[in-house]
């Protein structure tokens, strides 16, 4: 028996290497394998949003006007969620609800599921794009890892939360004012601001803003002067090979200000990555908790005392009453299918009124 040792020669016209070479070759806008997911999904998501906000009404799902055609502007137009009666249907154009009728599909809220799913895959494709580009340019994949934060928030808010509720109806609609309404909804129905995961998310995002401002100002303040220009933008050569700012000077400054300072660039920049990404992940975990209707902090003793003593009130008890007011007003307006009618005497009033 003869055993041949060696490489198997590929056919000249083998399709996979040709496609791989074309996708990953160096060009002005990199395509890559991730681009097969990113570009079509991003195109359809953006195109669907522009189409929906321009032409499509929310009259049949929310009883609202939501398009430019109906008189909305950029801040008030939205692609709204499907009606509550459609539960978690994918609302495919060819599905049993629309039966291939594009107009009916739009009226039922099919564009929302179209946007949510294509938007989610577009974000995932963008993260894969960062992974794919990291290797050829010899980077570590921290950009892609950090982008998992926004993806986690998007998936938790737009997909996981409504999956835990009765339908897509309770997810945010895609629009500026619609997102604001959803934030008020989260507060009124879940007391979102008093949840520890929301607090960690706020600390992460605002902490990252502070770190970003401090870092940018410090680097700008400690740049080496290598020219005689009159201002920052003309005094420095952007192509110089050596380091352009002084870590030692920055460390000395912040040591005097705070008593402590970063002495290692890698730890400093990792911390700037860690704080916002962790904050976004904590927010996403908190929203998953809301999908399961997990409760926030309850200070029942304060509620009982406020109910018994007209002169006792705390910011917490005022917020609880505010939440009840949001629920009473919003449920009747936002869920017309429930036919809720609240008489004036049951609407909450604080002790101070």
Swiss-Prot record:
Top-rank EC class of the record's enzyme:
oxidoreductase
Q: Which GO terms describe its molecular function?
A: chlorophyll binding; electron transporter, transferring electrons within the cyclic electron transport pathway of photosynthesis activity; iron ion binding; oxygen evolving activity
Q: What is its EC number?
A: 1.10.3.9
**What's this chain's function?**
Photosystem II (PSII) is a light-driven water:plastoquinone oxidoreductase that uses light energy to abstract electrons from H(2)O, generating O(2) and a proton gradient subsequently used for ATP formation. It consists of a core antenna complex that captures photons, and an electron transfer chain that converts photonic excitation into a charge separation. The D1/D2 (PsbA/PsbD) reaction center heterodimer binds P680, the primary electron donor of PSII as well as several subsequent electron acceptors. D2 is needed for assembly of a stable PSII complex.
Residues recorded as bearing N-acetylthreonine in the entry: 2
Its gene name is psbD
Q: Which reaction does it catalyse?
A: 2 a plastoquinone + 4 hnu + 2 H2O = 2 a plastoquinol + O2
What's a BP term from Gene Ontology annotated to this protein?
photosynthetic electron transport in photosystem II
Q: Which HAMAP family match?
A: PSII_PsbD_D2 (MF_01383)
Principal location: plastid
What PROSITE patterns does the record point to? REACTION_CENTER
Q: How does it sit in the membrane?
A: Multi-pass membrane protein
Binding sites annotated in the UniProt record for Fe cation? 215, 269
- Cofactor mode of binding and number, as noted: The D1/D2 heterodimer binds P680, chlorophylls that are the primary electron donor of PSII, and subsequent electron acceptors. It shares a non-heme iron and each subunit binds pheophytin, quinone, additional chlorophylls, carotenoids and lipids. There is also a Cl(-1) ion associated with D1 and D2, which is required for oxygen evolution. The PSII complex binds additional chlorophylls, carotenoids and specific lipids.
List the GO cellular component terms: chloroplast thylakoid membrane; photosystem II
Sites where Phosphothreonine occurs are at: 2
Keyword annotations of the record: Acetylation, Chlorophyll, Chloroplast, Chromophore, Electron transport, Iron, Magnesium, Membrane, Metal-binding, Oxidoreductase, Phosphoprotein, Photosynthesis, Photosystem II, Plastid, Thylakoid, Transmembrane, Transmembrane helix, Transport
Residues where chlorophyll a PD2 binds: 198
Q: How does it assemble?
A: PSII is composed of 1 copy each of membrane proteins PsbA, PsbB, PsbC, PsbD, PsbE, PsbF, PsbH, PsbI, PsbJ, PsbK, PsbL, PsbM, PsbT, PsbX, PsbY, PsbZ, Psb30/Ycf12, at least 3 peripheral proteins of the oxygen-evolving complex and a large number of cofactors. It forms dimeric complexes.
Entry PTM:
Only phosphorylated in mesophyll cells, phosphorylation increases when cells are grown under high rather than low light regimes (70 vs 900 umol photons/m-2/s).
Q: Which Pfam families match?
A: Photo_RC
Q: Which PANTHER family match?
A: PHOTOSYSTEM II D2 PROTEIN, PHOTOSYSTEM II PROTEIN D1
Name listed for the protein in its UniProt record: Photosystem II D2 protein
What family does the Swiss-Prot or TrEMBL record give for this protein?
Answer: Belongs to the reaction center PufL/M/PsbA/D family.
Read off the NCBIfam families from this record: psbD
Give TM regions: 41-61, 125-141, 153-166, 208-228, 279-295
Cystine links in this protein are none
